[in-house]
Amino acid sequence: MVSNIGIRPAEISSIIRKKIEEYDQEVKIVNIGTVLQVGDGIARIYGLDQVMAGELLEFEDNTVGIALNLESDNVGAVLMGEGLTIQEGSSVKATGKIAQIPVGDSYLGRVVNALARPIDGKGDIDTSESRLIESPAPGIISRRSVYEPMQTGLIAIDSMIPIGRGQRELIIGDRQTGKTAVAVDTILNQKGQDVICVYVAIGQKASSVAQVVNTFEDRSALSYTIVVAETANSSATLQYLAPYTGASLAEYFMYKGRHTLVVYDDLSKQAQAYRQMSLLLRRPPGREAYPGDVFYLHSRLLERAAKLSSQLGEGSMTALPIVETQAGDVSAYIPTNVISITDGQIFLSADLFNAGIRPAINVGISVSRVGSAAQIKAMKQVAGKLKLELAQFAELEAFAQFASDLDKATQNQLARGQRLRELLKQAQSSPLSVEEQVATIYTGINGYLDKLETQQVRKFLTEFRIYLSSNKLEFIEILKSTKTFTDKAETKLKEALHEFTEEFLTSA
């Protein structure tokens, strides 16, 4: 006998209605393509009709690529990894995103790669914000002219080729002339100045990068520094991206009203990586086989350095790009490009380096196009005469090689010049404060070094700076508070010089 089953139509209809409501009818349109060819860090993909230039692509093995060439029948993409397991015929998915990186205060003191992932073994970095790797540079209205000094701690630069906050100053020279040393010294000198530093190593040896990081650690500079490193064994794509990552990390702080300093070491390697990518993508080569848009590669990076207007918080990004020359040839393609983009250049000479003049800065052909506006008054008061005397000395020195008998005035001028040249020499990783620099230059241009033998000059100056900081604090205080070389400060400095010179000459 069949039992009566109570069918409740209301309950059934409510269940059906609930199921209908839960049914997700959303249709996702995913842009998918197929790999035609892969190799040398480049993939050619069929399909992907809706892809954007610069869009991130995801391959089956989770390798990420960037679509760079959008051609009529295929897309050329560069891979941000080895991509060894990508096969012909495998599928590729367009992500709809442009390359971006996480940013934040927690990056300070860390070493990261071009994708802002930590490579220093200190664990993950927690951040909540992100920025596009390629951000537009601030416009004309968003900027103001450079007016604050960015002290490097090197006498030759701070006195004669001064750099301001928001400036772009190129460091150019042959290999092994101390370009990285100048940049690293500048970062060390920012200690206590409330400046965030970003050091970008592009295509360097891993041992060189480790050495720089150790220097920062030893000198307590890592706490305000971020290191972005893509070494020589990294793929061309990552070497090409590294400078933009460094700029994005610095921009985060700049738009928060902070001062930042970015060192790109070096842009020649980035240009070579970009040339490799472009040639493999079959883009037409131009001068020195670089692609036609290699100027834009560097201009869009360096234009992001700026001094922001008061409405945007007066933050700044100072850029120190480094470019390597071959046998001092500044007229090659990349050097001329970067010289024309930047606001001046510091030229390092192999001849001066080999002659023992270090930092090997050729003051004659180095310039700073906006720096004088950023010099403090005290430095301006003493630096003008220094530059003039060194220029006259360089001219006389060339002439003196041919002349046998020189008059007394010329001999004195040559002797003074040699002592001034000694005064500009500085040991690596020993930046000087502005007060010490002003005192040092004043000593040289006012003849206090003329009585000494040339080889005694550096010992005299080192000991004098120690004497000044322990016995004549009033002089340092006047310069710190007024930023001007007042009559009172000059009197104090003269007193110190007379006292110390007597002491030094009697003990020598």
Curated annotation (Swiss-Prot):
Chief location: plastid
SUPFAM superfamilies: C-terminal domain of alpha and beta subunits of F1 ATP synthase (SSF47917), N-terminal domain of alpha and beta subunits of F1 ATP synthase (SSF50615), P-loop containing nucleoside triphosphate hydrolases (SSF52540)
GO terms for MF: ADP binding; ATP binding; proton-transporting ATP synthase activity, rotational mechanism
Enzyme Commission number, as recorded: 7.1.2.2
Record keywords, A-Z: ATP synthesis, ATP-binding, CF(1), Chloroplast, Hydrogen ion transport, Ion transport, Membrane, Nucleotide-binding, Plastid, Thylakoid, Translocase, Transport
Residues noted as binding ATP in the record, renumbered to the chain: 173-180
EC category name: translocase
A Pfam match: ATP-synt_ab_C
Record's bilayer topology term: Peripheral membrane protein
Domain of life: Eukaryota
Gene Ontology CC entries for this record: chloroplast thylakoid membrane; proton-transporting ATP synthase complex
Compartments where found: Plastid, Chloroplast thylakoid membrane
Catalytic activity: ATP + H2O + 4 H(+)(in) = ADP + phosphate + 5 H(+)(out)
Site (Required for activity) location in chain: 366
Similarity remark: Belongs to the ATPase alpha/beta chains family.
HAMAP family, alphabetized: ATP_synth_alpha_bact
Role: Produces ATP from ADP in the presence of a proton gradient across the membrane. The alpha chain is a regulatory subunit.
Subunit structure: F-type ATPases have 2 components, CF(1) - the catalytic core - and CF(0) - the membrane proton channel. CF(1) has five subunits: alpha(3), beta(3), gamma(1), delta(1), epsilon(1). CF(0) has four main subunits: a, b, b' and c.
Official protein name in the record: ATP synthase subunit alpha, chloroplastic
Species per Swiss-Prot/TrEMBL record: Chara vulgaris (Common stonewort)
Source organism phylogeny: Eukaryota, Viridiplantae, Streptophyta, Charophyceae, Charales
Gene designation per UniProt: atpA
